Design a protein with these regions (language model features):
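Domain-level signal for soluble alpha/beta catalytic cores
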Residues: 1-183
């Protein structure tokens, strides 16, 4: 009911934050996407899902250490998400080990590329942001690519969050200018 009231009040996008997919990746393609479909059923606004890799939880940090040099876990669920009614998929790309080529598995979806690391107070440069977007553009059409943060900025100091958002805007503008100059 809350989602329908929010939509009726003018909300354009409803994003589902999915913290369990990464823990239960083997099962998420079956039950997780069905749960998302059920939650989004009847909504006419844009729907998105953020599959969170998690922050600060010892079990999650330990799990990440076992993933090796490439985090290919998304490969298990992206085909099911691509076939779903969810419109957008949000990915953590800055300083993660998720290979950019996995984005190709989300054909037909808008891909929100996390270009800001929320686990560090170090502010990205516009060049770093533009480079991350350039990598994504090898696998996602320009009209389907959206720049975003890896996750929420709430835990960090306001001035750091502001600087990171400014880097996101400047980096996206830089990437756009480079694309436009090639056209």
């Amino acid at each position: 009911r809350v989602l329908f009231r929010s939509q009726a009040d003018g909300m354009d996008i409803i994003q589902f934050d999915e913290p369990a997919f990464n823990v239960y990746m083997a099962d998420a393609a079956q039950w997780g996407v069905k749960a998302l479909e059920r939650a989004a059923q009847g909504l006419t606004c844009t729907t998105a899902v953020h599959i969170c890799y998690g922050y600060g939880i010892p079990a999650n940090l330990d799990w990440k250490k076992t993933l090796g040099q490439e985090w290919r876990e998304y490969e298990k669920i992206f085909p099911a998400l691509a076939a779903s009614s969810i419109d957008q998929v949000s990915l953590e790309c800055m300083h993660s080990k998720v290979p950019a080529d996995l984005m190709a598995l989300l054909k037909g979806k808008d891909v929100m590329v996390g270009v800001i690391d929320v686990a560090s107070d170090v502010v990205e440069t516009p060049e770093e942001v533009a480079q991350t977007l350039a990598q994504a553009l090898k696998f996602v059409p320009r009209e389907r690519l959206l720049a975003c943060t890896n996750c929420g900025l709430a835990p960090m100091p306001r001035d750091v969050a502001q600087a990171k958002l400014e880097a996101l805007v400047a980096g996206a503008a830089l990437a756009r200018a480079r694309l436009d100059s090639q056209a």
